[in-house]
Amino acid sequence: MYDYLVVGAGLYGAVFAREAKKRGKSILVIDKRHHIAGNVYTEKKEGIHIHKYGAHIFHTNNKEVWDYVNQFAQFNHYINSPVANYKGELYPLPFNMYTFQKMWGVTLPEEAKEILDKQREGAGVKEPCNLEEQAIFLVGKDIYEKLIQGYTEKQWGRACKDLPAFIIKRIPVRFTYDNNYFDARYQGIPVGGYTQMVEKMLEGIEVKLGVDYLANKEIWDKQAKKVVYTGQIDAYFHYCFGTLEYREVSFETEVLDIPDFQRNAVVNYTDRDTLWTRIIEHKWFQFGKDDKGNDLDKTVISREYSTNWQKGNEPYYPINDEKNNTLYEKYKALSQKEDKVIFGGRLGEYQYYDMDKVIERALKKVEEEEIIENQRRTSGL
């Protein structure tokens, strides 16, 4: 019997498995997919590491987490600087002086602030109650209508008036000339891709792929003293309170026999009429070079589409509105009665976590498990 059965070979599962093994525990990792690394999985085409489930740029202010991931991969110095395309007009992101200069022709922060203040006053928003009001409060009506509204409504499948304000609070606004999207001390992408990094995390650990845990739960539960579950928490409990809502993302990926398509890794299409939310050109995550530093003659692009999640498909983003969060709390209360199961990760905790937060939580959980075990040993249980 194993000490832990880890369900899911994504970042949470891989980090937990690695750290538990270091503490002398026996581990079995299983995953329903036929590959490791979860949604950060990368695969190689034409010398290019393809982000199969969408763009993943690692960023963190946590030095402990940064040092941790650097044990398993060398990170390049990629800086996330996406571009917004509104009906052929290109705007730098995040919202900064370059954006304001293109939008209004201003060059000084005071000029941009004056325009924003007028647009806020005109909208009459003092305490934003939804995403639309929050966006106008942050960046004014012009930027909201051109660069936020259409993109966000495609991404979430709802009118901005019907989305919670907190979603837009993640978007940075700067009055400096700075196209670095993430205000993080550490940033980059693993040289050789994320899959290679997760492979190193799982070295020496037994892994079985193509295994559906929930389809044979009783059998798998007998294999270990404790289960670490990183799948959908509502599915674990057979949707007994109802189904939590997610957004689903699909991709159309093409290999193009040209050296350059858009000259940028990520371009967001912010008008409502363009069906895709963004186009990723993967070669620019590695600066247009292969692993040996050679120029790449071809390129690979992925058009990204957001839709409502359907059961049986891969869920991507939890929809953390009031209705779904209330439903999640019911499942969370049930999960706390499962003494031999740990629920973790985006799906297990129904939270939109960045990669560094997933790793942080997995490291913390292993430490908590060690403390519990030491307490039991001390008390003679």
Which role fits each region the language model picked out?
Residues K21-E46:
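Glycine-rich FAD pyrophosphate-binding loop
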Residues Y2, G24, I205, Q223-K225, ...:
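Short, well-ordered alpha-helix to beta-strand connector turns
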Residues R23, L214-L334:
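Mid-domain catalytic core of redox enzymes
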Residues Y2-V29, V366:
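N-terminal Rossmann-like FAD-binding beta1-loop-alpha1 element of flavoenzymes
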Residues L11-Y12, H34-H35, Y98, E153, ...:
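Short, solvent-exposed loop/turn segments at secondary-structure junctions
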Residues E314-L381:
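C-terminal catalytic lobe of FAD-dependent flavoproteins
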Residues E46-E121:
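Dinucleotide-binding Rossmann-like beta1-alpha1 core, especially the glycine-rich loop
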Residues K87-P92, M97-K225, T230, F237:
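Active-site/ligand-binding neighborhood in enzyme catalytic cores
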